[in-house]
């Protein structure tokens, strides 16, 4: 193999041939390791002025002879945007920051994999030459993928072609989901995607494996933040057969256990305020902390956390199995058609109701244990449950069941509806032909979740009071029905009485979500569950 070079080289971003000389390819590789580019932040050409023959050879090898001025300018500008600290190279911090702020459709957790694709093996940084090589090679592979998706060879990929391609990969999408993917890639508003749009959108996704790309579209471009807590994850038949599903359930279980344990003090304070705070005693968060610490010390803030963690496994398994079966029934009723967003919401809410019914006795025990005093658990949880049964019978394990069940649907429905409405309004007024960024989606998700909690919290409070009624002297004379509790609270404490304890409930949201996300990602990777 040989290349054509010049001696000397004129200033400029491209190489103009004056004198031809054939150089063996092994010499090119030798020289390419020694040539350092200028800083891209200055928008200077890689080679400027008269340089040696070796530098010209290395430059040709790195930039490819057929690179046009327009293409080089585009690559330079892209490189400059990624080089956040303007030090002339790209490292892991630059990529993480860029993925977070510039490409919200690609998770920042992909930065290490992307860096490995771009850099040389003997370096932990990406030079301009490395980046150019990556862009050209990656775009070439993306062009091959685009050709496979573009079944009618018209140079455009539309909704039907996305659906067909995903189906070949074992993923069935309805029109709504396929349109969501196309809209995120489409820059012109044409409801289809050309090659340049496809390459621009997928350029920083560090893989061209067809199966991985379809997984990326399905899990990152469709599932909305507002649904995450309400509708269980969907798994394809291939993922069910390969065992991916259980790895994600295990990762989710470990993440949930860590999150609940770290935020258990917030949960105990909330439960205590729900049951004991009134208009007359004016018990607040700070005074509650002092009271609980004085009664049982620091360890007392984790009362009830053990059973709260234990119930994760049966609840998750029951919800997953129920959700999968309900989806199948709905699909059979519809003749095999894909589920809509609200059909998934119905299936998820129904699965949640079934799983809650199965593990509800553990919910009651969690509340009782969170409210217990020092010394009331001297012989373990089983003995504690046996004492409850002896004193109150089997019905005590389902106290507050009705408000708990009724609280599932309004929370899920309001959360999803508000989220979709806010996202639609944002897209209509603040963006053109593109989806909102990460910060906008997080804001929509936070608002929708808050609305869902505000709507369902009175039911949660009544549920907790009914669960705790037998062991709380203050509540011994209170009604033992849901409607009776609502009347009692409104008559004696007013409307604000329905929101006792909501402050610590909101306080735990950010740390709970953050811890859960970090632990989930770590465990998922350790188990080898690759989901982009």
From Swiss-Prot:
GO CC aspect terms: mitochondrial inner membrane
InterPro entries attached to this UniProt entry: EF-hand-dom_pair, EF_Hand_1_Ca_BS, EF_hand_dom, Mit_carrier, Mitochondrial_sb/sol_carrier, Mt_carrier_dom_sf
Domain of life: Eukaryota
Keyword tags: Calcium, Membrane, Metal-binding, Mitochondrion, Mitochondrion inner membrane, Repeat, Transmembrane, Transmembrane helix, Transport
The keyword tRNA processing is assigned to this record: no
Keyword Repeat: yes
Topology of this chain in the membrane: Multi-pass membrane protein
Subcellular location: Mitochondrion inner membrane
Function per UniProt: Calcium-dependent mitochondrial solute carrier.
Name this protein carries in UniProt: Probable calcium-binding mitochondrial carrier CBG00135
Species for this entry: Caenorhabditis briggsae
